[in-house]
Amino acid sequence: MAEVTAALVKELREKSGVGMMDCKKALVENNGDIDASIDWLRAKGLSKAAKKADRVAAEGLVGIVVRAEGAGMIAAAVEVNAETDFLSRNELFQTAVRKIARAGLDNEGVEAISAAKTPDGEVVSDLLTHLIATIGENMVLRRSARFAVAHGAVASYIHNATAPDLGRIGVLVAIEGAGDQTKILELGRKIAMHVAATAPLSLSPDDLDQAAIEKERQIFTEQALESGKPPAVVEKMVEGRIRKFLEEVVLLKQAFVMNPDQTVEQLVAEAGKELGSPLTVKGFVRLALGEGVEKGPEGDFAAEVAAMTGQA
């Protein structure tokens, strides 16, 4: 059995927000395994925070660019990391992120974008190398996303923009369908703001990682069994919790932040009826700078979005 040291207890306490004695008990029960102990605490209803292990701090910018293509659109989003927040306000860095985002319009994936040329002919990887030498900070293209629709729109949204199309959170939402592109774009922007606020994990239940669902099911089952209720009742309790979980993390099933009385799926269907043509959300991406890292209070995104749209 692994020794439960004071350092292990301290680490688990910092990651879970649970008291020292409960952390020690969790570690004893799970042979000193931090991740297993966090799951154990969650199952007991003690953990105040989700797993926070293996998360890397990052600064820099998320950049977005959108290009009209006939009746459709192409859009790209990139996350370029740097060492300090100060660099996000540097014009050279901002210009570089915009160039990298534009390279993402015709190239998909970090590797392809890194090997591609910017609009002025410089290879993206060389651009970053030169910028590192000039500014003296390490920089890296961490993530990218690209959407294209032949008919419809790809809407974008930057939360708390540092400069036009640059900020700490960038969202793209691709909607396919015929009709007034301006209205489709308006719908897409509302959904993009919703995505920034709620951070859904998937577009539909089928897209959600089944391992994540089973993990939640196991935790919910352990919690329900502690109630002492009959197995049939426990099963219903668990299924109810799973439905609620999906409503919280699946975009189309979420309550729309600007009108909680309807889901995003219902919002899209209603908009399609108004346009006289069905609309389909083909995909979305939410790039948050240094995603998953706690850096202190950041405010309530849902409340901010509602306030910005006059829904508060």
From Swiss-Prot:
It comes from the Bacteria. The keyword Cytoplasm applies. One of its GO terms (cellular component) is cytoplasm. InterPro entries: EF-Ts_dimer_sf, Transl_elong_EFTs/EF1B, Transl_elong_EFTs/EF1B_dimer, Transl_elong_Ts_CS, UBA-like_sf. Keywords: Cytoplasm, Elongation factor, Protein biosynthesis. Residues 84-87 are annotated as: Involved in Mg(2+) ion dislocation from EF-Tu. It is found in: Cytoplasm. One of its GO terms (molecular function) is translation elongation factor activity. Associates with the EF-Tu.GDP complex and induces the exchange of GDP to GTP. It remains bound to the aminoacyl-tRNA.EF-Tu.GTP complex up to the GTP hydrolysis stage on the ribosome. Belongs to the EF-Ts family. This is Elongation factor Ts. It comes from Caulobacter sp. (strain K31).
